[in-house]
Amino acid sequence: IPGLAYGNSPSEYPRDFIENKILVITTTNGTKLLHLALKQGAKDIITGSFPNLSKVVEYLKEQNAPVILGCSGWKNRFNIEDVLFAGAVIEEIKDAFEIHCDSSFMANQLYNQHKNDLPTYIKTVTHWHRLAAYGLEEDMLYCISKDTAPSLPIFKDGALINKA
């Protein structure tokens, strides 16, 4: 189908290609997590990663409501880069929220242990090696770069919309 020959690499979606267009994107585990959150009655669902970390944190603090951070992983398995991002969020919101969860504590510790050199640490994880085999090292480095995409996708009325 014309126009549907794209993957999930950030480099495949330059601004001039996506600006002012409607995109339909599905992922293996991210889509599953979205459906699970909807099934469980989530009030608000936002999509976060290091490139929009500050927008995620700002939104969560504005809402001042209980939060569940869902790490979608890869092939239904634990994924370090997702947990690192959760740890980064927790680091930024922990003074505004009570956190009583071992997995959150662990994510925050992992992030704090590696936050000063994420590029070096990320090169040790399994996903780096999978993507490196396809020449996608720059994708991983982009995905751990903070605040390079100052937008906030929010799921509302059956669609992800951008809260810039």
List each language-model region with its residue ranges.
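Residue-level signal for well-ordered alpha-helical segments
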Residues: 66, 70, 117-120
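Short, structured patches in soluble enzyme cores that scaffold and shape functional sites
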Residues: 25-29, 47-50, 69-73
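Structured catalytic-domain cores with a bias toward divalent-metal coordination
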Residues: 2-10, 21, 50, 62-69
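Catalytic cores of nucleophile-dependent amide-cleaving enzymes
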Residues: 40-41, 49-66, 74
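A short acidic, often aromatic-flanked loop/helix-cap motif at beta-alpha or helix-coil junctions
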Residues: 1, 53-55, 76, 159-160
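Phosphate/ribose-phosphate-bearing ligand recognition and processing surfaces
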Residues: 72-82
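Long, charged alpha-helical interface segments
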Residues: 7-22, 26-28, 32, 36-44, ...
